[in-house]
Swiss-Prot record:
Keyword Transferase: yes
Name this protein carries in UniProt: Homoserine kinase
Metabolic or biological pathway, per its Swiss-Prot or TrEMBL entry: Amino-acid biosynthesis; L-threonine biosynthesis; L-threonine from L-aspartate: step 4/5
Cell location: Cytoplasm
Entry EC no(s): 2.7.1.39
Enzyme class, spelled out: transferase
Gene for this chain: thrB
Any GO CC annotation of this UniProt entry: cytoplasm
Family stated for the protein in its record: Belongs to the GHMP kinase family. Homoserine kinase subfamily.
GO MF annotations in UniProt: ATP binding; homoserine kinase activity
Catalytic function, reaction form: L-homoserine + ATP = O-phospho-L-homoserine + ADP + H(+)
Record's keyword terms, sorted: Amino-acid biosynthesis, ATP-binding, Cytoplasm, Kinase, Nucleotide-binding, Threonine biosynthesis, Transferase
Role according to the record: Catalyzes the ATP-dependent phosphorylation of L-homoserine to L-homoserine phosphate.
Amino acid sequence: MKILVPATSANLGPGFDCLGLSLKLFNETQIQKSGVFSISIGGEGSDNIFLKKNNIFVNIFYEIYEKLSGKKDNFRFIFQNNIPLSRGLGSSSAVIVGAIASAYYMSGFKVEKERILDEALIYENHPDNIAPATLGGFVCSLVEKNKVYSIKKEIDKDLAAVVVIPNLAMSTEQSRQALAKNLSFNDAVFNLSHASFLTACFLEKKYEFLKFASQDKLHEINRMKNLPELFEVQKFALENKALMSTLSGSGSSFFSLAFKDDALALAKKIQTKFKDFRVQYLEFDDNGFEIC
């Protein structure tokens, strides 16, 4: 079997832990039954020995496969990782979702996306990345009694993303330590109103309002202090036809949204101005993970 799982960008400014979308950048994993266990890693993380010795995908896969099938089989895993690691593009969510879905498939069980999403919550307790990695598109989610509830909206085909990827790994756990311990009532209301309005902008295609709807007072400023150049990236993107520009997930990557022609031009301009950063033009994925 082969499974493709997309990269994701979460929060989108004010939608902390609840909003996310899916990008056409995929981790590809092939799994075959084998006489002996083996693992091969290409792409991102291929030079990381730890990923071979203690691979999260493999650990989750075997845990679920053995629970479902009652068997202890050996498999050959071939990973082609295209999602940058620990850069706020959902690399951990892609691993979790991919491992669970693969385990269900190889156990002979029906792969139901709602079930996969609920199981993924066990390993990542916020749905902003795992939901778009599973469903694709723009997704708004909440958790109620250990169950994920998500509403998906396909993303306008005229839009594209420009993702700026610094050479700075930042785990979600590290990034959360930078968050403020307390929040004022006014700032809480600010984020509630902006996250709600941002969601409405995507649903109703009111893209002209995204620039201010995507503002945040909960997490971005504290997280971006780790890499102050991102404030310059954000300002530059918004001055060059980005509809919105926000920290991607917990960082360190930065996500900008624009109409396709503008996005292509913006990617070139950012790469020229910020030469130390990797820049990618990406279209949006509306399917979530796919088993081939």
